[in-house]
Amino acid sequence: NLLVSNGAARSDGTHYGWFENNESGMAWKLRFKNERMIKAETWKPSGEPCYWTKKGIGVVHFYNEDGTKWRIDFYKRGKIVSRKYQRKGSIHGPWTTWYENRQKSSEENYKNGKIHGIWTKWRIDGEKRGGKHYKEGQRHGVENTWYPSGQMAMESKWKDDQLISSVAWKPNGQKCPDTNVQD
């Protein structure tokens, strides 16, 4: 069994924790300044360090006793890019992303590695950009997109990943001509 501490905090803003049976002894060490993560070092249960991507995005893994883990990707300045949960190597649960200005970019949910539920996207200014419904990896339900003005751009209906109907509007709100959906 792998046991992970809840960690501790020092007055300099460093938070740290450890795996009891980890070769290196350390699981994670995070440094905060003004409530913002400025440095992160993490290790897998094997003692192998976690990494930075080629795009300069930091990656932190936290492992739970039940074998699940959650992953946080962050910008170099410590602001979170995304947070997702994994179970048995597959994404499972919520996956949320943010712009560097801390505005939420997207929110989606996964079930055993397949997108399941509502997927919502926002623009960098916080205005809703679109939303889709999924059922076990397939589009199922209503899909909407909006213009930056907030005007509806499109509404489509899906069933088992097959398009049933779609209506589109011009930026001025005028409905576009009907189009038939064919197999």
Language-model features: locations:
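Glycine/tyrosine- and acidic-biased, solvent-exposed loop/turn segments at the edges of beta-strands
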Residues: 1-183
